[in-house]
Every structure is written in C-alpha cells, then in structure tokens.
Amino acid sequence: MKTLRKMNGNKYLFYLLVAGIFGIMFLLNHYTFYAADDYSYMNSFATHKKIQTVWDIFPSMYAHAKGMNGRLVAHFFVQLFLLLPSGIFDVVNAVIFTMLILILYRYLFWNKKRNALALVSIFGLVWYFAPAFGQTMLWLDGSCNYLWGCTFSLYYLYPFMKLAKNEKVMEGKIQKILFLVAGFAMGDYLETASFGTIVLAVLLLAYHRWMKKEKFPVWGMGSVLTMLAGFLFMMTAPGTLKNKVATSGLHGYVDNFINAMDLYVEHLLILLLILIVLIVCSVIL
C-alpha cells in the first residue's frame, strides 16, 4: 500500500502523465481535419476573399460583428489559426486541453500533494462526459470557442478563488492592469462562459466581503466591470441583435436555457448524484 501511495505521489509519474495527455490530444488534433464553418472562416467577412495576412482579420472581425455576432475574440483565434499552418493549431490546442485538465486538478486539490490517479481520473471524466468531444475539443472552430472559452474562464476565476481562500493575489500593478484588460476579452469570448464567469466572480467577491469580512478589492470590482463591458459589447453587436435577438427574441433565450438544463440532466446527472453523495458523506463523517 505504501508503495502504491508513493508511486501515486511521484512527481516524475505525474509529469509523464501530463505529457501523455498532451501527446494523446496532439495526435487526435493532428488527425482532425477542417470541417463545416472552418472553410467559411478562411475567408474575410469584409471582402469575402481568402485571408492572406493577420491584418486581414481585423476588418473581417468588424464585418463579423455587424453581420454575424459579437463573439470576436474566439473567432479572431479561429481565423488566425486557419491562416497559420495546421500543425501550429494541433500543438496549441493540445496545450489548451492539457491546461484545462491541470486547472481542474488545481481546483479540486488546491495545494495538496501530487496525485497521479486523480489526474488520470479527471482526464477520463472530461473525455467521457464532455458532450460532442470531437466538436468541442478537436474541431478548430468548435475548440476555439468551447474548449478555449471554458479553459480561459477557469483560469480567469482562479484569482477570485485565491481571494476567497484568503491567499495573496494580484500584488503587482502591471498584473492588475493586464487582468482588467483580459476581463474585457473574457466578457466578449462566449455567451455562456462569459456570463457564468461574471456571476461566479461576483459570488466569490460577495463571499470574500460578507463571509470573510474583507473589503472588495479594486482589481476584483474592476475586472467584473470590464467583463460586463465585454459581455455587453458582444450581446449588443449589430450581428447579434439581428441574428439572435431579432429572430428569436427573449423567449429564444428562455428556450435555450431550458434545453441546456435538459442536456445537463441527460449528460451530467450521474456526476451530480456523485457530488451529492460526497457532500452528504463529508457532513456525516
């Protein structure tokens, strides 16, 4: 038993597994080819011609905001990586997925010792429970939106989690400024991820204020405001208003919310039941 525990906490095994996760995702990305919207995003939304340089992306995104939607950060990455050799995206996307696994591990175990079994378990759970794994984790357009949006959200919330735990965070001025700027990008990234990040950030700040009896940090309040600015920019873009609000109205958002809850029940009910059991056990024991 001691040998197994020692092996489970071995840092070299842990890092080897991290490298293995990266390798698996790199191979899967390498053999995932362009599909569907990838081909339309190869062309500029402004000129309808093939994008040749990075500078072509900026007028394309301006036209995208007017005609499609205001989700510009995610689609900037889509057009950027469609412009670059495909191998670059294979590496970057594998890195982002590995970062997702690591931040989930960090949230669950915080500052505890390395746990190789837990790392593999998190990878397996994400693999099994992520809806449409290929579309959200491998496909270029889909992963730039959903995988990256989820990963960026968890990393952006990390300082708020540290704050709630009374740990030191955001001590440098440059760090705070960059965090505020990143807040606008986070708010403009993906409707669901952006809104969820804003709500969770507010809840963590409220917990810090009323449960820990501490003042609201300036960087925390400022980042919520920049996220809100980015979110409003995305939701009020002419393309968003024309294609989403105008066609479906408020009831469309209500229907989407109901459908999303149905999907959560369908795919994540088992995880929810496990969570309830663990919470009950932690209270009783």
Report the location of each language-model feature.
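Transmembrane catalytic cores of multi-pass membrane glycosyltransferases
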Residues: 29-87, 91, 140, 189-285
